[in-house]
């Protein structure tokens, strides 16, 4: 009897030990899972553990919350702004890629998600009521099927003030109702999109580029503001994070990322070596080379391409700002906003660069990172009203520069 009792005790002790071992293995598994790094590991995780229906419900709830208020009007009263159709948690010290797009150009998000590993903020402009509805459907579809969209992207919507966007009903049949993967959504978007020439909306509504830029970079400490059809070099986000984390002395400095454009048939270069090979044979050239060479010339491309190869990202040289330079840059601190009076084509970015200069910012060109625009910018690819818009904004820019003198009366700098 005593032997039987001892055997039972030993059995229960063994069972308890086995259960504890299983629990420890589960905790170890969860710990390893939470420590996954890199896109490949994340893709494997979502392949075997697809998002639960609850996460999709949360997306719908966020959309409903953002749209239910009816949005807010911008300062001009011409546009209705819906903040946070998608929201994401962002480290306040992170570098956010801020961009803007018409609905038809959202297809470029796919390339940005691949190249930029950090958080993105996207402002979408819908020129018509139908486009506003399509934008909400696209937001729902992309966030439902693309884990990266849910994890890393904040999305906002702007439309003419006379329109209101509505919550999409995923049960209704439509172009995106039966899609089941992220790639299917982008493939479908590429087929139904009708991208036209630059800024040609086909309506009497102006594209509010500076309103969209401000909305996308809102709340960011460090932001790289680019056009949606540009692609950053591979690893740029990680290199920027490492550089900025090593030093806190970047307030008042605009870290310039050199911008290029590539012949449309070419594959996007991933690193500086690939870029230089294409640059040497004329397949890559400075951004805006065929439209406004002085707009990017101060970057000093000849100096940049001849810098010695380095592994760490750093500022390579200082460039005094001069009119009409409009660089793409990363800056922290109290960065002036883009003046939202500038719409459509002309002087919308240079006006902000001018104010940066007057406000006391210095411009330093980075040694390794870069941006590439998809396709050469050509005069014939712009809409017929381009020159008229440019002349209108040129007059506004002259007024803007006079206003800066009153805004910064003690600044020794001018544009």
UniProtKB/Swiss-Prot annotation:
Organism's domain of life? Eukaryota
Record's InterPro entries?
A: B4GAT1
What membrane topology does the annotation report for this chain? Answer: Single-pass type II membrane protein
Where are glycans found on this sequence? 204, 300
**What pathway or pathways are given for this protein in its record?**
Protein modification; protein glycosylation
What's an example GO BP annotation here? axon guidance
Record topology, Lumenal segments:
37-415
Pull the Cytoplasmic topological domain ranges from the record: 1-8
What reaction(s) does this enzyme catalyze? 3-O-[beta-D-Xyl-(1->4)-Rib-ol-P-Rib-ol-P-3-beta-D-GalNAc-(1->3)-beta-D-GlcNAc-(1->4)-(O-6-P-alpha-D-Man)]-Thr-[protein] + UDP-alpha-D-glucuronate = 3-O-[beta-D-GlcA-(1->3)-beta-D-Xyl-(1->4)-Rib-ol-P-Rib-ol-P-3-beta-D-GalNAc-(1->3)-beta-D-GlcNAc-(1->4)-(O-6-P-alpha-D-Man)]-Thr-[protein] + UDP + H(+)
User: What keywords are assigned to this protein?
Assistant: Glycoprotein, Glycosyltransferase, Golgi apparatus, Manganese, Membrane, Metal-binding, Signal-anchor, Transferase, Transmembrane, Transmembrane helix
Q: What is its EC number?
A: 2.4.1.-
Location in the cell = Golgi apparatus membrane
- Broad enzyme group: transferase
Q: Name one GO cellular component term.
A: Golgi apparatus
Q: Which cofactor does it need?
A: Mn(2+)
Record's Pfam families? Glyco_transf_49 (PF13896)
What this protein is reported to do is described as: Beta-1,4-glucuronyltransferase involved in O-mannosylation of alpha-dystroglycan (DAG1). Transfers a glucuronic acid (GlcA) residue onto a xylose (Xyl) acceptor to produce the glucuronyl-beta-1,4-xylose-beta disaccharide primer, which is further elongated by LARGE1, during synthesis of phosphorylated O-mannosyl glycan. Phosphorylated O-mannosyl glycan is a carbohydrate structure present in alpha-dystroglycan (DAG1), which is required for binding laminin G-like domain-containing extracellular proteins with high affinity.
* Similarity-based family: Belongs to the glycosyltransferase 49 family.
Q: How does it assemble?
A: Interacts with LARGE1 and LARGE2.
What protein is this chain from? Beta-1,4-glucuronyltransferase 1
Q: What is the lineage of its organism?
A: Eukaryota, Metazoa, Chordata, Craniata, Vertebrata
